[in-house]
Structure formats: structure tokens, C-alpha cells
Design a protein with these regions (language model features):
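Gly/serine-rich nucleotide phosphate-binding loop at the start of the catalytic core
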Residues: 2-87
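Electropositive nucleic-acid engagement tracts
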Residues: 48-49, 60, 64-128, 240, ...
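Conserved short loop/turn motifs at secondary-structure junctions
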Residues: 57-58, 88-91, 214-221
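Short, glycine/acidic-rich beta->alpha junctions
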Residues: 64, 99, 144, 220-224, ...
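Electropositive, glycine- and tryptophan-enriched low-complexity nucleic-acid-binding patches
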Residues: 83-87, 140-212
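Active-site-proximal, Lys/Arg-enriched surface segment
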Residues: 89, 93-171, 283-286, 290, ...
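Short, well-ordered, mixed-charge alpha-helical segments that flank or form enzyme active sites
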Residues: 125-127, 160-161, 171-176, 223-227, ...
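An internal, acidic/charged active-site-proximal segment
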Residues: 186-302
């Protein structure tokens, strides 16, 4: 499942570049696939694993519609290939994290990101067997049955594509020993809120991967402003998020508008600082810190 998401991301990455190449030279598609496979699967210890990874990547690019293992295997030799690929995805010993990091690093080298975007990923399911399936009343989706996750998107001027994701596991799964055992949920995985899941998804990427530290756009409901924003502040990562109109903030930088205004809403701070607004583009600097020009240093009041 994790590999499926990675393949979808790679498909987005390859799309425009490869479509242009294929229009002129059909054989460039496979050459580009091999080139990207060498980058993505370099962490695989065995040659046969790297080869299967390349075949899976090529099959996912050729498959139209739903990219299930069965549909992908149809381009690789039918039922025998399906069984082999199913084992490779579900039961092999390779680690998926280096694959995701390799994708994000490769993209960053091609074109540095402007931001990392966290976005909800609802996955409708009819049955009960998929890990994390639950039925909830969602304020946006209404009554929803399925899995809930958060994706982390690489966002540049020319391309937006997912590079990682984190599955939300409800308490009904984590407190059920039978479900935990059947789904092979690690012992160290504990309960978290949807908000915590969204934050952890992107901080795990920026805290452990070799990717540029860019501002985070957090497209998720933020209810615990002090806790959530505090995590980004401690990590030194600017964040853009929606907050309620009753939440109050304090401007910390004495040189910025609103510093002497006490506790203000986000809208009041934005109005006071409207003279500082400017269109942001990529710079030559390797990182974006909390003290960057044009960045408001604010913190929620407690």
C-alpha cells in the first residue's frame, strides 16, 4: 500500500517530462524509467528487488485507470507476474522510507520546492479488512467510511506531487489486540489525533530526510493551536495554517506592526502587516528560517 502511493507520486513526476519524450521518441520512456528506478531503488540490497521495483514502476506508468497489482501485472506477464509482484509489495524485506526520501531528494535537485503541503487523503472503503477503516461523521465529508490519511506534497513552480503519507489509525484499531496482530501494527504505535497525524506526517519528512527546509502549508483543521504551532516553532519551520477567528496571537518581533497591540486575532495581525506583503519566490538560500525577511514572528497567547 505504501508502495502504491509512491508509484502514484512517481507517475506524477514522470508525467509531463515523459509524455513529451514519448511523443518524439517512444524508447525514451523506458530509458527514463530505468534512470528514475536507479535513483528510487538504490537502497534495495538485492538485484532482483531492484529489477522488480523497475518493473512495477514501468507497469504503473503503462496502466490506465486503477493501478492495482492485478492491472499492473497484466503488462508484465499475467497471473505468474501478479503473484510475484504481490509478494514483492506485501511480504518482501525492503524498507519503503528510503524510496520516498529518494523521490523527494531527486525532485528537490531537479527543481527546489517552494513549499511542503500537507493535505488530507480520505480513502473510501466498503469492507472492514483494510487497516484503519472506520465510519465517522466528518465535518467536510459528512458520513464517511474508509481510511483517513495525510499526504505530504512537494510543491514547486512547475510540479506538485505527493512524496510521503501517513495513515491515521483510530483507537478502535489500536486498542483491539486481534486487529493489531492481524494488521501487524508495531507495538510502539500509539493513539494520536487527526491533527497530530497531519503534523507528524510532515515533520517526519523535514526532520529526517535530506530535503530543503521550506515553509509548510498545513491544509488541515487546527484545533490545538498552541501545541501544533509550537511543534513547528521548535523545529524552526514556518507554517501557514487556517485557525479559528477567536484564536488570539501575540506578535513577538518589536520591529513588526502589531507588537504593542497585545493579543490579536490572525486577521488583525494580517491587516496591520499588510504593508509587508509581497510575492515570494525561490531564493538562492538553502533554507527558510523563522527570521526570514517578510516573515511575521507570532505566537499563540495562552
Amino acid at each position: 500500500m505504501s508502495f502504491d502511493e509512491g508509484a502514484a507520486a512517481v507517475h506524477d513526476v514522470a508525467g509531463a517530462r515523459w509524455r513529451m519524450a514519448v511523443e518524439e521518441h517512444g524508447d525514451l520512456r523506458e530509458a527514463a524509467t530505468r534512470e528514475l528506478a536507479d535513483v528510487l531503488f538504490a537502497s534495495f540490497p538485492r538485484r532482483d528487488q531492484r529489477r522488480k521495483g523497475e518493473l512495477y514502476l514501468l507497469g504503473s506508468l503503462k496502466t490506465q485507470g486503477r493501478k492495482s497489482i492485478r492491472n499492473i501485472a497484466a503488462h508484465m506477464g499475467g497471473s505468474a507476474a501478479e503473484q510475484s509482484m504481490h509478494h514483492f509489495i506485501s511480504s518482501s524485506t525492503w524498507d519503503w522510507k528510503p524510496v520516498r526520501e529518494a523521490l523527494a531528494s531527486h525532485l528537490s535537485r531537479l527543481s527546489p520546492p517552494q513549499a511542503w503541503v500537507v493535505h488530507p487523503m480520505p480513502i473510501p472503503k466498503a469492507g472492514d479488512l483494510s487497516v484503519g477503516v472506520d465510519q465517522v461523521l466528518d465535518p467536510v465529508l459528512g458520513t464517511f467510511r474508509g481510511q483517513r490519511a495525510f499526504g505530504v506534497w512537494y510543491a514547486s513552480e512547475s510540479l506538485n506531487t505527493p512524496v510521503s503519507w501517513r495513515l491515521f489509525l483510530p483507537g478502535s484499531w489500536l486498542r483491539d489486540e486481534t486487529r493489531r496482530r492481524q494488521a501487524e501494527i508495531p507495538d510502539g504505535i500509539g493513539e494520536e489525533t487527526l491533527e497530530e497525524c497531519a503534523v507528524e506526517a510532515v515533520l517526519d519528512v523535514l526532520g529526517s530526510w535530506k530535503v530543503p527546509p521550506r515553509p509548510v502549508v498545513l491544509n488541515a483543521h487546527v484545533g490545538h493551536v498552541t501545541t501544533t504551532m509550537g511543534r513547528f516553532t521548535r523545529a524552526g519551520i514556518p507554517v501557514i495554517a487556517r485557525v479559528g477567528d477567536t484564536v488570539r496571537f501575540v506578535v513577538h518581533d518589536p520591529a513588526l506592526p502589531g507588537h504593542a497591540g497585545g493579543r490579536l486575532t490572525a486577521q488583525q495581525i494580517a491587516v496591520a502587516a499588510r504593508g509587508l506583503r509581497r510575492r515570494m519566490g525561490l531564493t538562492e538560500r538553502s533554507g527558510v528560517g523563522a527570521g526570514s525577511p517578510g516573515t511575521l514572528a507570532v505566537g499563540p497567547s495562552v
